[in-house]
Amino acid sequence: MLQIDHLTMHSLQSGRLFLDDFSYTLRPHERTVIIGEEGNGKSALLKYIYDPTLVEGYMECKGRRIVSREILGYLPQSIDEEEKKVPVYAWFCQQDGFYDMNPSSLGAMAAEMGLEADFWYQDRSFGTLSGGEQIKAMLAALRIKKPTIYLLDEPSNNLDLDVLAWLEKEIVQLPGAVLFVSHDVHLIDACATGVIHMEQLHRKNHPRITVADVDYETYREQRFAAMENQREKAVSDQKKEKLRQQKLQRQYSSVDYALNHISRQDPHGAKLLKKKMKSIKSTEKRYAREKEDMATLPEEEESIVIELSGAPIAPGRKVLELKNYCLKTSDGTLLCPSLNFAVYGPKKIAIIGSNGAGKSTLLRQMLDLLRQAGFQTGYMPQNYAEVLSPEMTPIDFLAPHGDRDSVTVARSWLGSLRYTSEEMTHEVRELSGGQQGKLLLLKMALEKDEVLVLDEPTRNFSPLSQPVLDAAIRNFPGAVISVSHDRQYLGTVPDVIYRLDENGLVEYSGFIGEDR
Protein backbone atom coordinates (compact mmCIF):
# COMPACT_ATOMS: atom_id res chain seq x y z
CA MET A 1 0.00 0.00 0.00
CA LEU A 2 1.24 3.48 -0.91
CA GLN A 3 0.35 6.20 1.57
CA ILE A 4 0.95 9.95 1.53
CA ASP A 5 0.53 11.63 4.91
CA HIS A 6 -0.03 15.38 5.29
CA LEU A 7 2.19 16.35 2.36
CA THR A 8 2.90 20.03 1.78
CA MET A 9 4.86 20.99 -1.32
CA HIS A 10 5.99 24.43 -2.41
CA SER A 11 8.44 25.88 -4.93
CA LEU A 12 11.84 26.87 -3.58
CA GLN A 13 12.14 29.64 -6.18
CA SER A 14 8.72 31.29 -6.20
CA GLY A 15 7.35 30.06 -2.87
CA ARG A 16 4.14 28.99 -4.60
CA LEU A 17 2.21 26.32 -2.74
CA PHE A 18 1.30 23.26 -4.83
CA LEU A 19 0.01 20.92 -2.11
CA ASP A 20 -1.24 21.78 1.35
CA ASP A 21 -1.67 18.99 3.93
CA PHE A 22 -2.47 16.35 1.29
CA SER A 23 -3.13 12.79 2.40
CA TYR A 24 -3.86 9.89 0.09
CA THR A 25 -3.77 6.09 -0.06
CA LEU A 26 -3.35 4.11 -3.29
CA ARG A 27 -4.87 0.68 -2.83
CA PRO A 28 -3.85 -2.50 -4.71
CA HIS A 29 -5.07 -2.78 -8.31
CA GLU A 30 -6.35 0.81 -8.49
CA ARG A 31 -5.78 2.82 -11.67
CA THR A 32 -5.72 6.46 -10.61
CA VAL A 33 -5.05 9.41 -12.91
CA ILE A 34 -3.59 12.75 -11.81
CA ILE A 35 -5.08 15.63 -13.80
CA GLY A 36 -4.74 19.41 -13.65
CA GLU A 37 -3.68 22.46 -15.60
CA GLU A 38 -0.15 22.89 -16.90
CA GLY A 39 2.37 23.76 -14.21
CA ASN A 40 0.18 22.64 -11.28
CA GLY A 41 2.76 20.16 -9.98
CA LYS A 42 1.46 16.83 -11.32
CA SER A 43 4.85 15.52 -12.47
CA ALA A 44 6.52 16.83 -9.32
CA LEU A 45 4.06 14.86 -7.16
CA LEU A 46 4.70 11.68 -9.16
CA LYS A 47 8.48 12.15 -8.88
CA TYR A 48 8.22 12.76 -5.13
CA ILE A 49 6.23 9.57 -4.67
CA TYR A 50 8.88 7.59 -6.57
CA ASP A 51 11.94 9.25 -5.05
CA PRO A 52 11.79 12.51 -3.03
CA THR A 53 15.38 13.35 -4.02
CA LEU A 54 14.21 13.93 -7.62
CA VAL A 55 12.43 17.16 -6.59
CA GLU A 56 14.54 18.39 -3.69
CA GLY A 57 16.41 20.81 -5.96
CA TYR A 58 13.29 22.84 -6.72
CA MET A 59 10.58 21.81 -4.25
CA GLU A 60 10.42 21.83 -0.46
CA CYS A 61 8.30 18.90 0.72
CA LYS A 62 7.04 18.25 4.24
CA GLY A 63 5.06 15.19 5.18
CA ARG A 64 5.41 11.43 5.08
CA ARG A 65 5.63 8.98 2.19
CA ILE A 66 4.98 5.39 3.25
CA VAL A 67 5.79 2.62 0.76
CA SER A 68 6.26 -0.35 3.07
CA ARG A 69 7.04 -3.57 1.17
CA GLU A 70 6.11 -1.94 -2.15
CA ILE A 71 8.31 -1.98 -5.27
CA LEU A 72 7.91 1.23 -7.28
CA GLY A 73 8.39 1.44 -11.03
CA TYR A 74 8.63 4.90 -12.63
CA LEU A 75 8.12 5.85 -16.29
CA PRO A 76 9.43 9.43 -16.80
CA GLN A 77 7.91 11.83 -19.31
CA SER A 78 11.17 11.69 -21.27
CA ILE A 79 14.72 10.39 -20.92
CA ASP A 80 17.77 12.63 -20.92
CA GLU A 81 19.93 13.23 -23.98
CA GLU A 82 22.88 11.22 -22.67
CA GLU A 83 20.69 8.17 -22.11
CA LYS A 84 19.46 8.40 -25.71
CA LYS A 85 23.02 7.84 -26.93
CA VAL A 86 23.27 4.44 -25.21
CA PRO A 87 22.77 1.33 -27.43
CA VAL A 88 19.49 -0.50 -26.82
CA TYR A 89 21.19 -3.64 -25.47
CA ALA A 90 23.42 -1.63 -23.13
CA TRP A 91 20.35 0.31 -21.97
CA PHE A 92 18.51 -2.89 -21.05
CA CYS A 93 21.59 -4.23 -19.29
CA GLN A 94 21.36 -1.23 -16.95
CA GLN A 95 17.78 -2.11 -15.97
CA ASP A 96 16.99 -4.06 -12.81
CA GLY A 97 16.27 -7.74 -13.41
CA PHE A 98 17.27 -7.89 -17.10
CA TYR A 99 20.11 -10.37 -16.51
CA ASP A 100 17.65 -12.68 -14.75
CA MET A 101 15.45 -12.98 -17.86
CA ASN A 102 15.94 -15.97 -20.16
CA PRO A 103 15.69 -15.63 -23.98
CA SER A 104 12.36 -17.46 -24.20
CA SER A 105 10.75 -15.10 -21.66
CA LEU A 106 12.11 -12.07 -23.51
CA GLY A 107 10.88 -13.48 -26.82
CA ALA A 108 7.39 -14.00 -25.40
CA MET A 109 7.34 -10.45 -24.03
CA ALA A 110 8.50 -9.04 -27.38
CA ALA A 111 5.70 -10.88 -29.19
CA GLU A 112 3.14 -9.69 -26.65
CA MET A 113 4.30 -6.07 -27.02
CA GLY A 114 4.51 -6.16 -30.81
CA LEU A 115 8.32 -5.89 -30.91
CA GLU A 116 10.91 -7.78 -32.94
CA ALA A 117 12.21 -10.91 -31.20
CA ASP A 118 15.78 -9.52 -31.09
CA PHE A 119 14.68 -6.04 -29.98
CA TRP A 120 16.51 -6.39 -26.65
CA TYR A 121 19.88 -7.04 -28.29
CA GLN A 122 20.00 -4.28 -30.91
CA ASP A 123 23.09 -2.07 -31.06
CA ARG A 124 21.41 1.08 -32.41
CA SER A 125 21.14 3.94 -29.94
CA PHE A 126 18.05 4.27 -27.77
CA GLY A 127 17.36 7.72 -29.24
CA THR A 128 16.87 6.26 -32.73
CA LEU A 129 13.85 4.25 -31.56
CA SER A 130 10.44 5.59 -32.51
CA GLY A 131 8.29 7.15 -29.79
CA GLY A 132 6.24 3.98 -29.57
CA GLU A 133 9.33 1.77 -29.34
CA GLN A 134 10.78 3.94 -26.56
CA ILE A 135 7.59 3.72 -24.50
CA LYS A 136 7.41 -0.04 -25.04
CA ALA A 137 11.07 -0.41 -24.05
CA MET A 138 10.57 1.57 -20.85
CA LEU A 139 7.38 -0.32 -19.98
CA ALA A 140 9.19 -3.60 -20.68
CA ALA A 141 11.97 -2.54 -18.31
CA LEU A 142 9.34 -1.84 -15.66
CA ARG A 143 7.68 -5.22 -16.18
CA ILE A 144 11.06 -6.95 -15.88
CA LYS A 145 11.56 -5.13 -12.58
CA LYS A 146 8.15 -6.47 -11.45
CA PRO A 147 6.97 -3.47 -9.43
CA THR A 148 3.85 -3.60 -7.29
CA ILE A 149 3.06 0.03 -8.13
CA TYR A 150 3.52 1.65 -11.56
CA LEU A 151 4.05 5.43 -11.72
CA LEU A 152 3.60 6.66 -15.31
CA ASP A 153 4.16 10.27 -16.41
CA GLU A 154 2.35 11.08 -19.68
CA PRO A 155 2.80 7.56 -21.10
CA SER A 156 0.82 8.36 -24.28
CA ASN A 157 3.06 11.20 -25.50
CA ASN A 158 4.32 10.72 -29.09
CA LEU A 159 2.49 7.43 -29.66
CA ASP A 160 0.66 6.56 -32.86
CA LEU A 161 -2.96 5.38 -32.81
CA ASP A 162 -2.10 1.67 -32.94
CA VAL A 163 0.34 1.95 -30.04
CA LEU A 164 -2.18 4.03 -28.08
CA ALA A 165 -4.73 1.22 -28.37
CA TRP A 166 -2.05 -1.21 -27.15
CA LEU A 167 -1.10 1.10 -24.26
CA GLU A 168 -4.68 1.31 -23.00
CA LYS A 169 -4.89 -2.48 -22.79
CA GLU A 170 -1.43 -2.65 -21.22
CA ILE A 171 -2.28 -0.20 -18.41
CA VAL A 172 -5.52 -2.02 -17.63
CA GLN A 173 -3.72 -5.39 -17.51
CA LEU A 174 -0.62 -4.34 -15.56
CA PRO A 175 -0.27 -6.27 -12.30
CA GLY A 176 -0.43 -4.10 -9.21
CA ALA A 177 -1.63 -0.52 -8.84
CA VAL A 178 -1.10 2.28 -11.36
CA LEU A 179 -0.83 6.01 -10.68
CA PHE A 180 -0.44 8.02 -13.88
CA VAL A 181 -0.39 11.57 -15.21
CA SER A 182 -2.10 12.08 -18.56
CA HIS A 183 -3.72 14.68 -20.81
CA ASP A 184 -5.23 12.05 -23.13
CA VAL A 185 -8.98 12.00 -22.44
CA HIS A 186 -9.52 8.72 -24.29
CA LEU A 187 -6.71 7.02 -22.37
CA ILE A 188 -8.07 8.36 -19.09
CA ASP A 189 -11.61 7.22 -19.89
CA ALA A 190 -10.37 3.75 -20.83
CA CYS A 191 -8.03 3.19 -17.87
CA ALA A 192 -8.74 5.33 -14.82
CA THR A 193 -10.78 4.01 -11.89
CA GLY A 194 -9.98 7.04 -9.74
CA VAL A 195 -9.06 10.72 -10.12
CA ILE A 196 -6.72 13.11 -8.32
CA HIS A 197 -7.45 16.65 -9.52
CA MET A 198 -4.82 19.31 -8.74
CA GLU A 199 -5.99 22.93 -9.03
CA GLN A 200 -4.58 26.41 -8.36
CA LEU A 201 -7.18 28.99 -7.27
CA HIS A 202 -7.06 32.73 -6.55
CA ARG A 203 -4.48 33.46 -9.26
CA LYS A 204 -2.43 30.41 -8.24
CA ASN A 205 -2.21 31.47 -4.61
CA HIS A 206 -4.32 28.67 -3.17
CA PRO A 207 -4.02 24.96 -4.06
CA ARG A 208 -7.02 22.64 -4.03
CA ILE A 209 -6.81 18.90 -4.53
CA THR A 210 -9.80 16.64 -5.05
CA VAL A 211 -9.70 12.84 -4.78
CA ALA A 212 -12.55 10.81 -6.28
CA ASP A 213 -12.82 7.01 -6.37
CA VAL A 214 -14.76 7.02 -9.64
CA ASP A 215 -13.92 6.92 -13.34
CA TYR A 216 -13.15 10.20 -15.11
CA GLU A 217 -16.49 10.59 -16.90
CA THR A 218 -18.38 10.08 -13.64
CA TYR A 219 -16.06 12.55 -11.91
CA ARG A 220 -16.73 15.19 -14.57
CA GLU A 221 -20.49 14.65 -14.31
CA GLN A 222 -20.50 14.72 -10.51
CA ARG A 223 -18.25 17.78 -10.42
CA PHE A 224 -20.44 19.66 -12.91
CA ALA A 225 -23.66 18.69 -11.10
CA ALA A 226 -22.25 19.66 -7.70
CA MET A 227 -21.05 23.03 -9.00
CA GLU A 228 -24.38 23.72 -10.70
CA ASN A 229 -26.30 22.82 -7.54
CA GLN A 230 -24.01 25.01 -5.44
CA ARG A 231 -24.30 27.85 -7.97
CA GLU A 232 -28.13 27.64 -8.00
CA LYS A 233 -28.31 27.51 -4.21
CA ALA A 234 -25.87 30.41 -3.89
CA VAL A 235 -27.91 32.55 -6.31
CA SER A 236 -31.13 31.64 -4.46
CA ASP A 237 -29.59 32.38 -1.06
CA GLN A 238 -28.21 35.70 -2.29
CA LYS A 239 -31.63 36.69 -3.63
CA LYS A 240 -33.34 35.78 -0.34
CA GLU A 241 -30.65 37.59 1.62
CA LYS A 242 -31.09 40.72 -0.48
CA LEU A 243 -34.88 40.72 0.02
CA ARG A 244 -34.73 40.23 3.78
CA GLN A 245 -32.00 42.85 4.14
CA GLN A 246 -34.17 45.31 2.20
CA LYS A 247 -37.13 44.50 4.47
CA LEU A 248 -34.96 44.87 7.56
CA GLN A 249 -33.62 48.22 6.31
CA ARG A 250 -37.16 49.50 5.76
CA GLN A 251 -38.12 48.45 9.30
CA TYR A 252 -34.99 50.07 10.71
CA SER A 253 -35.57 53.33 8.83
CA SER A 254 -39.21 53.45 9.90
CA VAL A 255 -38.48 52.86 13.59
CA ASP A 256 -35.46 55.19 13.53
CA TYR A 257 -37.57 57.97 11.99
CA ALA A 258 -40.32 57.42 14.56
CA LEU A 259 -37.82 57.54 17.43
CA ASN A 260 -36.37 60.83 16.18
CA HIS A 261 -39.80 62.42 15.89
CA ILE A 262 -41.79 61.01 18.82
CA SER A 263 -43.10 63.51 21.33
CA ARG A 264 -41.54 63.71 24.76
CA GLN A 265 -45.07 63.58 26.10
CA ASP A 266 -45.32 59.92 24.88
CA PRO A 267 -42.75 57.99 26.97
CA HIS A 268 -44.69 54.73 26.63
CA GLY A 269 -44.59 54.98 22.82
CA ALA A 270 -40.86 55.74 22.93
CA LYS A 271 -40.28 52.69 25.10
CA LEU A 272 -42.11 50.46 22.62
CA LEU A 273 -40.10 51.90 19.72
CA LYS A 274 -36.79 51.29 21.53
CA LYS A 275 -37.86 47.73 22.23
CA LYS A 276 -38.70 47.27 18.54
CA MET A 277 -35.32 48.74 17.50
CA LYS A 278 -33.57 46.31 19.84
CA SER A 279 -35.46 43.45 18.18
CA ILE A 280 -34.43 44.71 14.72
CA LYS A 281 -30.76 44.85 15.73
CA SER A 282 -31.01 41.36 17.21
CA THR A 283 -32.49 40.13 13.93
CA GLU A 284 -29.65 41.84 12.05
CA LYS A 285 -27.07 39.93 14.11
CA ARG A 286 -28.93 36.66 13.54
CA TYR A 287 -28.97 37.30 9.80
CA ALA A 288 -25.22 37.96 9.87
CA ARG A 289 -24.62 34.61 11.59
CA GLU A 290 -26.89 32.80 9.14
CA LYS A 291 -25.13 34.43 6.19
CA GLU A 292 -21.91 32.64 7.13
CA ASP A 293 -23.65 29.31 6.49
CA MET A 294 -25.20 30.31 3.18
CA ALA A 295 -23.97 28.72 -0.04
CA THR A 296 -21.32 30.67 -1.91
CA LEU A 297 -20.61 30.60 -5.62
CA PRO A 298 -18.33 27.63 -6.42
CA GLU A 299 -14.64 28.38 -6.79
CA GLU A 300 -13.25 27.24 -10.12
CA GLU A 301 -9.74 27.34 -11.50
CA GLU A 302 -9.49 30.07 -14.11
CA SER A 303 -9.56 28.61 -17.60
CA ILE A 304 -7.12 29.65 -20.31
CA VAL A 305 -8.19 32.17 -22.95
CA ILE A 306 -6.60 32.00 -26.40
CA GLU A 307 -7.63 33.24 -29.83
CA LEU A 308 -5.54 32.59 -32.93
CA SER A 309 -6.82 35.49 -35.01
CA GLY A 310 -4.28 35.10 -37.83
CA ALA A 311 -4.55 36.30 -41.42
CA PRO A 312 -7.43 34.88 -43.49
CA ILE A 313 -6.76 32.82 -46.61
CA ALA A 314 -9.34 32.92 -49.39
CA PRO A 315 -11.15 29.65 -50.16
CA GLY A 316 -9.59 27.96 -53.16
CA ARG A 317 -6.21 29.68 -52.86
CA LYS A 318 -3.39 27.15 -53.21
CA VAL A 319 -1.31 27.03 -50.05
CA LEU A 320 0.94 24.05 -50.73
CA GLU A 321 1.25 21.38 -53.40
CA LEU A 322 3.59 18.39 -53.50
CA LYS A 323 3.87 16.38 -56.74
CA ASN A 324 5.82 13.12 -56.78
CA TYR A 325 7.69 14.46 -53.75
CA CYS A 326 10.51 12.25 -52.48
CA LEU A 327 10.53 12.23 -48.68
CA LYS A 328 13.95 11.63 -47.12
CA THR A 329 15.46 12.22 -43.71
CA SER A 330 18.35 14.65 -43.24
CA ASP A 331 20.84 11.76 -43.53
CA GLY A 332 19.32 10.63 -46.84
CA THR A 333 17.23 7.71 -45.61
CA LEU A 334 14.32 7.19 -48.00
CA LEU A 335 10.91 7.26 -46.32
CA CYS A 336 8.57 7.64 -49.29
CA PRO A 337 9.64 7.73 -52.98
CA SER A 338 6.59 9.55 -54.35
CA LEU A 339 4.22 11.68 -52.34
CA ASN A 340 1.32 13.79 -53.65
CA PHE A 341 -0.49 16.31 -51.49
CA ALA A 342 -2.22 19.70 -51.76
CA VAL A 343 -3.77 22.24 -49.39
CA TYR A 344 -6.20 24.91 -50.56
CA GLY A 345 -7.78 27.79 -48.65
CA PRO A 346 -8.30 27.77 -44.88
CA LYS A 347 -8.39 23.98 -44.63
CA LYS A 348 -7.53 22.20 -41.40
CA ILE A 349 -5.40 19.15 -42.24
CA ALA A 350 -4.21 16.42 -39.85
CA ILE A 351 -1.64 13.73 -40.63
CA ILE A 352 -1.49 10.42 -38.77
CA GLY A 353 0.77 7.41 -39.21
CA SER A 354 2.94 4.89 -37.44
CA ASN A 355 5.83 6.04 -35.27
CA GLY A 356 8.87 6.37 -37.52
CA ALA A 357 6.86 6.89 -40.72
CA GLY A 358 8.37 10.36 -41.15
CA LYS A 359 5.50 12.65 -40.11
CA SER A 360 7.67 15.15 -38.24
CA THR A 361 10.25 15.09 -41.05
CA LEU A 362 7.53 15.82 -43.61
CA LEU A 363 6.12 18.61 -41.46
CA ARG A 364 9.51 20.35 -41.18
CA GLN A 365 10.01 20.13 -44.94
CA MET A 366 6.51 21.52 -45.55
CA LEU A 367 7.38 24.39 -43.21
CA ASP A 368 10.46 25.24 -45.30
CA LEU A 369 8.44 25.14 -48.53
CA LEU A 370 5.70 27.37 -47.10
CA ARG A 371 8.19 29.98 -45.93
CA GLN A 372 10.00 29.86 -49.28
CA ALA A 373 6.63 30.55 -50.92
CA GLY A 374 6.26 33.68 -48.78
CA PHE A 375 3.58 32.52 -46.35
CA GLN A 376 3.70 33.90 -42.80
CA THR A 377 3.89 30.56 -41.01
CA GLY A 378 3.72 29.68 -37.32
CA TYR A 379 5.42 26.50 -36.14
CA MET A 380 5.00 24.31 -33.07
CA PRO A 381 7.52 21.45 -33.15
CA GLN A 382 7.17 18.28 -31.14
CA ASN A 383 10.42 19.18 -29.40
CA TYR A 384 9.92 22.74 -28.13
CA ALA A 385 13.69 23.17 -27.72
CA GLU A 386 13.91 23.58 -31.52
CA VAL A 387 12.53 27.12 -31.13
CA LEU A 388 12.78 27.88 -27.40
CA SER A 389 16.15 28.67 -25.84
CA PRO A 390 16.29 27.30 -22.26
CA GLU A 391 17.85 30.52 -20.92
CA MET A 392 15.22 32.93 -22.29
CA THR A 393 12.16 34.06 -20.36
CA PRO A 394 8.59 34.15 -21.73
CA ILE A 395 8.88 37.94 -21.98
CA ASP A 396 12.16 37.60 -23.93
CA PHE A 397 10.52 35.19 -26.37
CA LEU A 398 7.34 37.20 -26.99
CA ALA A 399 8.92 40.67 -26.88
CA PRO A 400 12.52 40.21 -28.10
CA HIS A 401 13.11 43.94 -28.64
CA GLY A 402 12.13 44.72 -25.05
CA ASP A 403 10.22 47.94 -25.81
CA ARG A 404 7.57 48.90 -23.28
CA ASP A 405 4.56 48.45 -25.56
CA SER A 406 5.63 44.97 -26.67
CA VAL A 407 6.33 43.90 -23.09
CA THR A 408 2.92 45.20 -21.98
CA VAL A 409 1.17 43.24 -24.73
CA ALA A 410 3.20 40.12 -23.91
CA ARG A 411 2.31 40.33 -20.21
CA SER A 412 -1.38 40.75 -21.05
CA TRP A 413 -1.40 37.69 -23.29
CA LEU A 414 0.58 35.62 -20.81
CA GLY A 415 -1.93 36.54 -18.12
CA SER A 416 -4.76 35.24 -20.33
CA LEU A 417 -3.03 31.84 -20.28
CA ARG A 418 -2.74 31.91 -16.47
CA TYR A 419 0.94 32.83 -16.16
CA THR A 420 1.71 34.54 -12.86
CA SER A 421 3.97 37.61 -12.79
CA GLU A 422 6.80 35.45 -11.45
CA GLU A 423 6.41 32.81 -14.17
CA MET A 424 6.66 35.50 -16.86
CA THR A 425 10.28 36.09 -15.83
CA HIS A 426 11.30 32.46 -15.19
CA GLU A 427 13.72 30.83 -17.60
CA VAL A 428 12.07 28.50 -20.12
CA ARG A 429 13.93 25.53 -18.63
CA GLU A 430 11.95 26.04 -15.39
CA LEU A 431 8.54 25.90 -17.10
CA SER A 432 6.41 22.79 -17.57
CA GLY A 433 5.89 21.33 -21.04
CA GLY A 434 2.37 22.76 -21.14
CA GLN A 435 3.59 26.24 -20.23
CA GLN A 436 6.20 26.07 -23.00
CA GLY A 437 3.52 24.96 -25.46
CA LYS A 438 1.41 27.96 -24.46
CA LEU A 439 4.35 30.24 -25.31
CA LEU A 440 4.43 28.93 -28.87
CA LEU A 441 0.67 29.45 -29.19
CA LEU A 442 1.00 33.05 -28.00
CA LYS A 443 3.79 33.70 -30.49
CA MET A 444 1.48 32.53 -33.28
CA ALA A 445 -1.39 34.63 -31.93
CA LEU A 446 0.80 37.76 -31.91
CA GLU A 447 2.33 37.25 -35.37
CA LYS A 448 -0.92 37.04 -37.39
CA ASP A 449 0.16 33.93 -39.28
CA GLU A 450 -1.47 32.71 -42.49
CA VAL A 451 -0.57 29.05 -41.96
CA LEU A 452 0.05 27.04 -38.80
CA VAL A 453 2.29 23.96 -38.87
CA LEU A 454 1.71 22.00 -35.67
CA ASP A 455 3.43 18.81 -34.52
CA GLU A 456 1.35 17.17 -31.76
CA PRO A 457 -0.15 20.51 -30.62
CA THR A 458 -2.16 19.07 -27.70
CA ARG A 459 0.53 16.78 -26.27
CA ASN A 460 1.17 18.77 -23.08
CA PHE A 461 -2.23 20.35 -22.51
CA SER A 462 -4.56 19.19 -19.77
CA PRO A 463 -7.98 17.66 -20.50
CA LEU A 464 -9.44 20.90 -19.13
CA SER A 465 -7.43 23.20 -21.44
CA GLN A 466 -7.67 21.06 -24.56
CA PRO A 467 -11.23 22.04 -25.61
CA VAL A 468 -10.13 25.70 -25.58
CA LEU A 469 -7.06 24.88 -27.68
CA ASP A 470 -9.07 22.73 -30.10
CA ALA A 471 -11.58 25.54 -30.63
CA ALA A 472 -8.80 28.11 -31.18
CA ILE A 473 -7.17 25.97 -33.89
CA ARG A 474 -10.51 25.08 -35.46
CA ASN A 475 -11.50 28.78 -35.65
CA PHE A 476 -8.12 29.96 -37.00
CA PRO A 477 -8.91 31.82 -40.28
CA GLY A 478 -5.87 30.50 -42.15
CA ALA A 479 -4.72 27.00 -43.06
CA VAL A 480 -3.54 24.43 -40.52
CA ILE A 481 -1.30 21.43 -41.26
CA SER A 482 -0.85 19.28 -38.18
CA VAL A 483 0.44 15.93 -37.01
CA SER A 484 -1.54 14.40 -34.18
CA HIS A 485 -2.50 11.14 -32.54
CA ASP A 486 -4.82 12.82 -30.05
CA ARG A 487 -8.19 11.23 -30.69
CA GLN A 488 -10.18 14.11 -29.25
CA TYR A 489 -8.31 16.59 -31.46
CA LEU A 490 -8.69 14.37 -34.53
CA GLY A 491 -12.39 14.02 -33.87
CA THR A 492 -13.11 17.75 -33.67
CA VAL A 493 -10.52 19.93 -35.47
CA PRO A 494 -9.42 18.72 -38.95
CA ASP A 495 -11.49 18.88 -42.12
CA VAL A 496 -9.43 16.07 -43.62
CA ILE A 497 -7.17 13.40 -42.10
CA TYR A 498 -4.35 11.79 -44.11
CA ARG A 499 -2.35 8.69 -43.18
CA LEU A 500 1.36 8.64 -44.05
CA ASP A 501 3.18 5.42 -44.92
CA GLU A 502 5.83 4.29 -47.40
CA ASN A 503 3.27 4.62 -50.22
CA GLY A 504 2.52 8.29 -49.54
CA LEU A 505 -0.38 10.25 -48.05
CA VAL A 506 -3.81 8.66 -48.30
CA GLU A 507 -7.03 10.23 -47.07
CA TYR A 508 -8.15 8.42 -43.93
CA SER A 509 -11.82 7.63 -43.47
CA GLY A 510 -11.66 5.51 -40.32
CA PHE A 511 -13.49 6.36 -37.12
CA ILE A 512 -11.58 8.62 -34.76
CA GLY A 513 -12.94 10.33 -31.66
CA GLU A 514 -16.57 11.01 -30.86
CA ASP A 515 -17.55 13.34 -33.69
CA ARG A 516 -16.49 11.34 -36.73
Question: Which residue stretches match the model-derived regions?
Answer:
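ABC ATP-binding cassette signature C-motif
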Residues: M1-N229, A314-R516
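Flexible nucleotide-interacting loop at or near the entrance of a catalytic core
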Residues: M227-L334
